[in-house]
Amino acid sequence: MKNKKKYILFGAVDIGYRIEHYSKFIENHLSHRLQAESFSKYILPSSHYKTKYTFSCPIDKTHPILLYSFSFCFFIFSLFRYDIFHFISGETILTRRLRSMELKIYKLLGKRVVMHFVGSDIRSEEYLTMKEKNIHQFLKGEDFGEKSMLSQKKLIADAKHYADYIIVSTPDLKKIIPNSIYYPVVLDYQKFLDEVSAISFKPKSNNEVVILHSPSSVKKSNLKGTNHIMSVLNKLVASNKYNIRLILPAENNVERKTNYSASRYELFSYYNEADIVIDQMIIGWYGLLSVEALVAGKYVVSYVEESLKEELFPECPIKMADVNTLEKVLIEIIEEILKGKNPFMCDIQRNWVKKYHTIENMNEELLTAWHLKSNI
């Protein structure tokens, strides 16, 4: 007997531009077994980055009564339509106060629930702030207690109790939810290349070395270690030894429509300009910014916690640094750039990303989460 096609819903917030990418993968490779649809409560302006969802009800643009009414009606509709619910960052269809009840209903009806956590949803800002302020002690082996707030612990408890599968996007989160599965960020490789190549950018002058540091949030740049990074960058610039130009979107005092320091399209332009991209010095793992910058052919610098280095994929091309070694690592990279960088570097980096950070080559965890056989 032929298996009936199942329906999966992605929602209800799209962190890291996952939803359209995952849906595209299903359409291209699994359409005979799975139909993907999406619902989002948060919609970024198209000027930031154009993406699409099957259903949406923007929480910041919808009257609360209309929002609650739409969400409730969509929830009832979803019970009859979907077999699998893949929730990103802990956001479900109904309000957070009703999350436990909502997840319980899915479980009672035999629905498959996947909870997909990306970082700030279960790792508290207070913990990272404490880590940032005491990063030198942390590097010596000291830690700073609770990694999750009370509300996050409730979310974690709900996920453990009701979810069939829990995914985390950075391996440090496995310490918070030990039974979770690490699934790395993946890049829509060809789409990214096409979009970056279509963006204009400011050309470099001779012997100029351009360094980009762009924390995602202007208000929370300390969580990426921006203060420590700026201290090193300012020292390098002040030395006048190198012709350095800095691209620092979070430092620009401009009014923005979102909390992001730069739109994704602006980032594409910055990738084209930069020689070096610095990700973060606090969290302890690299993110989508690093992956994109590698594909763009840039030197990428990031901090990876010592205890997490065993989780790195083989031959990782990211230059590892912490707040103590960042200056030394940057000087080594600058000297290499001025001498003439390896002509094969870009190809090496792109091949590494294709192997370990594309959904075409890294999908086993998702197929397991969706309760599908591993072959596509």
Annotate each PLM feature.
Residues 1-49:
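N-terminal subdomain of nucleotide-sugar transferases
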Residues 17, 339-371:
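A charged, aromatic-enriched C-terminal amphipathic alpha-helix characteristic of glycosyltransferases
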Residues 73-80, 101-112, 132-165:
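Membrane-proximal helix-turn-helix segments that form the acceptor-binding/catalytic region
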Residues 138-140, 144-202:
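Donor nucleotide-sugar binding/catalytic pocket of nucleotide-sugar-dependent glycosyltransferases
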Residues 185-262:
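Conserved catalytic-core segment of nucleotide-activated headgroup transferases in glycan assembly
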Residues 281-282:
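Aromatic "clamp/platform" in nucleotide-sugar-dependent glycosyltransferases that forms part
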Residues 299-302:
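Short hydrophobic beta-strand element within catalytic cores of glycosyltransferases
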